[in-house]
A protein has these predicted regions:
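EAL-family c-di-GMP phosphodiesterase catalytic domain
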Residues: 35-36, 90-97, 116-131, 143-251
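Catalytic-core regions built around general acid/base machinery
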Residues: 106-109, 135-143
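Conserved long alpha-helical elements within nucleotide-processing catalytic cores of c-di-GMP signaling
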Residues: 43-47, 56, 134, 138
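Inter-domain helical "communication" segments and dimerization helices
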Residues: 5, 9, 54-55, 67, ...
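Catalytic core of bacterial c-di-GMP phosphodiesterases, primarily the EAL and HD-GYP domains
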Residues: 18, 22-27, 54-132, 208
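Short amphipathic alpha-helical segments
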Residues: 1, 10, 46, 59-67, ...
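Active-site core of bacterial EAL-family cyclic-dinucleotide phosphodiesterase domains
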Residues: 1-48, 88, 149, 227, ...
């Protein structure tokens, strides 16, 4: 693919903060810096990458940028080893027998701890082959990686199996966060997910937080962390490093 050879893909980073406004992590998002169209979001090209077998190359680009960023933040004494960056893993990647090897090839190159990489999988992926999913997750967790369930509440996984999956985190989808202020149902769904996460000893992150009213309410609801435009828009690694440094110094 010409765009890969031309280095047009890169990771953008969106910070996650806790209820004390401390930066606790970030999510890495693939972007295509198209020479004519400008910055293109992942939803426009990921299906094509999946179809033509380029998805692993894109993941490696993102992981490469994550490692560079983590090392820069460490070198400037901005983070410690508890800081982690999330990366989205597709169904085909998760099912690949090469996933663990691909991950270690890159993090070993940069001397990054596996525990600083959080693998985000969607809720729907949990229900495809439960036994295989648990085995694959346990193998990667044994190697040090962390797991997060992205867009929780939008899929069809059985809650009875949720405790069997060795995940660290649930992420509440933006579609629910949008409704917490003006919908009793929206509020109750978000509160239920938070309570469920707490009962299973999982961290819960709210995605798509855009207003101070949402932030304040989620804080009262005992959320663990938040991300969204209110905190910061996604930034390239240089922009993120500056943002993180400024916000760490301000704390």
């Amino acid at each position: 693919m010409r765009a890969i050879a031309s280095n047009e893909f890169c990771a953008y980073f969106q910070p996650q903060v806790n209820t004390q406004s401390n930066v606790v992590g970030a999510e890495a998002l693939i972007r295509w810096n198209h020479p004519q169209r400008g910055l293109i979001a992942a939803n426009e090209f990921i299906p094509i990458a999946e179809q033509y077998g380029f998805i692993q190359k894109l993941q490696n680009i993102v992981l490469h940028d994550i490692c560079i960023l983590i090392n820069e933040l460490k070198a400037n004494a901005i983070i410690d080893n508890s800081f982690s960056v999330s990366i989205n893993i597709s169904q085909s990647q998760f099912n690949s027998s090469n996933l663990k090897g691909e991950l270690f090839n890159i993090i070993n190159k940069f001397d990054i701890r596996a525990s600083q990489i959080k693998l985000e999988i969607t809720e729907s992926m949990l229900s495809s082959d439960i036994d295989y999913t648990i085995r694959q997750m346990k193998e990667l967790i044994a190697a040090g990686f962390l797991f997060s369930i992205d867009d929780f509440g939008t899929g069809y996984s059985c809650l009875a199996y949720l405790s069997a999956f060795p995940v660290k985190e649930l992420k509440i989808d933006k579609s629910f966060i949008d409704k917490i202020l003006d919908s009793t149902v929206g509020f109750n769904i978000a509160q239920t997910i938070i309570s469920l996460g707490k009962s299973l000893n999982l961290e819960v992150v709210a995605e798509g937080v855009e207003t101070t009213e949402q932030y304040d309410l989620l804080k009262k609801m005992n959320i663990d962390a938040m991300q969204g435009y209110l905190i910061a828009r996604p930034m390239d690694k240089e922009g993120y490093a500056k943002w993180h440094s400024a916000n760490t110094n301000a704390q």
